[in-house]
Amino acid sequence: MEETAEKTPVEAYSTLKPKGLMKMKKTALVAFIAGAALLLFGGVGAFYLWKVTEKEAISAHLGRNIDIKIENDSDSAEGTIVEVQDFKAGITAVKFPGKEKCFIKSQARTELSEDEAGVKAEVASLVWITSEEPLKDSSFLSPEILRFCADLPIYWHHPANSRALRKRRSATRMRRQTSAGVNRQPARRRNSTASARDERPTGPEYNPENPYHQNQGSEGTMVFDPMLDHRGICCTECHRSYTHCERVCEPLGGYWPWPYNYHGCRPVCRLIMPCRWWAARVLGLV
């Protein structure tokens, strides 16, 4: 009897232990299934919401009343700018009042706050430049932008920094000044050459004893033998020297006639001076 009494609590404990483990396992399994289901539904819901917001963000008509002053407009100086923003493509379409055009510009970055915009405007202001020709291929634009612009010609709006504009103007000005300076240099050289020629001394006064000036006198008494000029000793009619060259060949001798009996031909040049220069040199005037 004692043995049975001692064994009874042990058996009862052993039967209770597996039941507790089974309950814990069932609870954990149910919690795991519920968590997986929640994660699945949460992922599906987030994906659906993301797709909906992406569709709604494209081509939202945003009309903003902005008080602006438009030149060459109607009697009223107030107008309304209407914009259509395509966030997916990063393009904004703009319509100005009184303008029969539709402008598109790229969204380089998100809009700045008022403080940042003020600082940005102080650092470097942007100037928008319109393209000269309208857009030819508009296939990349969204249907909302095409519907917004309708049949109006579409032009690109490009931002240009004021510093870049000043730099481009200065480069054009420098190029113009450089070309003008290059054109002025030949004229300046011609003027300086003419002034130097005018300032150059005209030479010594008339000297009747100088052979150079004797032919300029009324009598012209100095006469030279024409054979001096014929033999190449001096030039009777020249006022400046000149170089006279001739070909000198040495005869070979032998059977072959001229020009095969000559070899070693070389040019020999002489400086022919005016005969009046020689006469002036003899007289000691030169």
From Swiss-Prot:
Glycans are attached at N191. The lineage of its organism: Eukaryota, Metazoa, Chordata, Craniata, Vertebrata. Belongs to the chondromodulin-1 family. Coiled coil: none annotated. The keyword Glycoprotein applies. Keywords: Chondrogenesis, Cleavage on pair of basic residues, Developmental protein, Differentiation, Disulfide bond, Extracellular matrix, Glycoprotein, Membrane, Secreted, Transmembrane, Transmembrane helix. It comes from Danio rerio (Zebrafish). Disulfide bonds join C102-C149, C234-C238, C235-C275, C245-C269, C249-C265. This is Leukocyte cell-derived chemotaxin 1. Residues 166-176 have a biased composition (Basic residues). One of its GO terms (cellular component) is membrane.
